[in-house]
C-alpha cells in the first residue's frame, strides 16, 4: 500500500516539476522535447521482452551497445547540422553530389514519417479501445483519422508553438510515469535480493544471425534524434546540436536503466513480446503501475507522432527549396492528409516495416553525406577520424537496411 502511494506521488511530483511554467518556457527544453519524444516512442515498452527473449541476461549489454551506436549516428547528424547545412545553403547546391545524397535521404525520411505518424496514432487508437474492450478496425481507423486531422489542422492554424506545447505535455506525463516505474521496479528488486538470481547467460536456442538482425531493428526503435535537424526555422545550429545530444543521453540512460531494473523479472515473461507484456509484468511490482503504463504508452504514441509531424514540417520546407517555398505548416497538414489516406487504404501494421527500412536508409545516406563533407574540408581542418567513422557507420547502416527485423 505504501509503495502504491509513493509511486503515485513520484509521478505527480515529477509531472508538476516538468510542467512548471519555468520549465515549459525554457527554449532549450522545448528544443530537447521533440527528439526526446520521438526517441522514446512506440518501441519503448516492447524492447524489454524482445531483448529478454533474444539475449537473456545480456539484455542490458545489448541495449547499451544499441544506444552507443545510435549516439555515434547522432554525431553524424550533428556534424551535418554544423557543416553540411552551410554547404546546402549555397546556390545550386542541389545539383552537387552532396546535395543529391541529402535529397534522396530526405525523400526516404519523408516516406518514413508519413507511415510512422499514422502507425503511432493507429496504435494509440487500438490501445485506447482495448481499455474499453472494443475490437473494431473501423472505430480505430476513425479515431486515428480524427486525431490526424486534429493535429494537421491545429498545426496549420496554430503553428509550431502549439505542437511543441502538445509535445511538452505528453512527454512530461510520459517521463513522470517512467520515473515512477524505474523507482518502483528498483524497490521491487531491492526487496527481493535474496531470491534474485541474474545469470549472465544466453538462451540455449540462441540464433546469432537472428540476434544481429534484431539488434539492427532495435537500433531503429531508438531513432528520432534526427528531428532536431529539421527545427532550423525555430532554433540555431548550436541549440539543435546541444539539445539533440541531451535528448540522446537522457533517452539512452532511460532505456538502459529500464532494461537493468526489469532483468530480474524477465523469467516471468511468457512468449508475448508486445507492449502489453511489460504492462502485465509490472503487476508484480505494484497494482498502480499497469494503468500508469497504459497512460505512458498512449502518451508515447501521441508525443512521437507529434514530434515526427513537427519534423515533417521542417523537412517539407527544406525539400521544397526556394522554388516552391512551402511553409512548415503545409507539412503538418500534408502528413495528416497522407496519414488519413494510409489508414483507410493500407494495413499500417504491415507497411511499418517499410518505414523502418526507410529510416535506416536515411541514416545511411546522412552518414555518407557526412563522410563527403568531412572529406571535402580543408586539409588543415579535415579530421581523418570523422571521415573513417562516418564511412563505417554508413556501411553498417546500408547493411541494416537489408537485414534488419523491425522491432516496433
Question: Language-model segments: what does each one mean?
Answer:
Residues 30-31, 55-62, 75-115, 130-141, ...:
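Transmembrane-helix boundary/entry motifs in multi-pass membrane transporters
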Residues 109-123, 234, 288-323, 352-355:
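Membrane-helix boundary/coupling elements in multi-pass transport proteins
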Residues 90-91, 121-143, 233-237, 242-252, ...:
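Helix-loop-helix connectors at the membrane interface of multi-pass transporters/channels
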Residues 1-21, 46, 61, 181-184, ...:
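A generic transmembrane alpha-helix motif of multi-pass inner-membrane proteins
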Residues 128, 141-188, 352-367, 385-392:
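Membrane-interface loop-to-helix entry segments
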Residues 20-22, 137-139, 143-145, 161, ...:
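Helix-loop-helix junctions that connect adjacent transmembrane segments
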Residues 89-98, 248-302, 318-323, 336-340, ...:
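TM-loop-TM module centered on a large, flexible mid-protein loop between adjacent transmembrane helices
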Residues 2-30, 50-105, 126, 247-252, ...:
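Extracellular loop-to-transmembrane helix junctions
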